[in-house]
Amino acid sequence: MATRALLLLLLLPPLLLLAGCAARPAPPRAPRHSDGTFTSELSRLRDSARLQRLLQGLVGKRSQQDPENNTAWTKSGEDRLCQLWSHMPALQAWMPMKPPVDQAWSPWLPPGLRAGALVSEPAIPAAEGSPMPP
């Protein structure tokens, strides 16, 4: 009987403490800055300016006073480009020469072999005077 009472005294307090903690609700938490309850006027202005820059960047409408995004030069450049492309000798002089197709490098062929078809001699020579097939 004494062992039973001693066992009951040892196990009862932790059980009561665990049951008591689960029954009580947690105290209400004070509102925090991370909840968004506090915003200063400066942070509001920064957020609105950031959003405005993002929208302007997405839409592509920047102010005309912004020197880095001024696109007044594009029209004259396009005209010059069209004139350059219409002058073929100047274009051909500017472009590098390409090797002929039979001397072109191929990743599938070993060095020494060239791209193109190899033509072998006919197995039976044609008689003189008979036409060769094309």
UniProtKB/Swiss-Prot annotation:
Coiled coil stretches, renumbered: none
Q: Which residues carry this modification: Valine amide?
A: V59
Q: Name one GO molecular function term.
A: hormone activity
Presence of the UniProt keyword Secreted in the record? yes
Positions of the pro-segment in this chain: 22-31, 63-134
Signal peptide range equals 1-21
| Gene Ontology annotations of biological process type | adenylate cyclase-activating G protein-coupled receptor signaling pathway; diet induced thermogenesis; hippocampus development; intracellular water homeostasis; positive regulation of lipid catabolic process; regulation of appetite; regulation of synaptic plasticity; response to nutrient levels
Gene3D superfamilies in the record, alphabetically?
Answer: 6.10.250.590
Q: Its domain of life? A: Eukaryota
Q: What does this protein do?
A: Hormone involved in different processes, such as regulation of the pH of the duodenal content, food intake and water homeostasis. Exerts its biological effects by binding to secretin receptor (SCTR), a G-protein coupled receptor expressed in the basolateral domain of several cells. Acts as a key gastrointestinal hormone by regulating the pH of the duodenal content.
Family classification: Belongs to the glucagon family.
Stated name of the protein: Secretin
Q: Which gene encodes it?
A: SCT
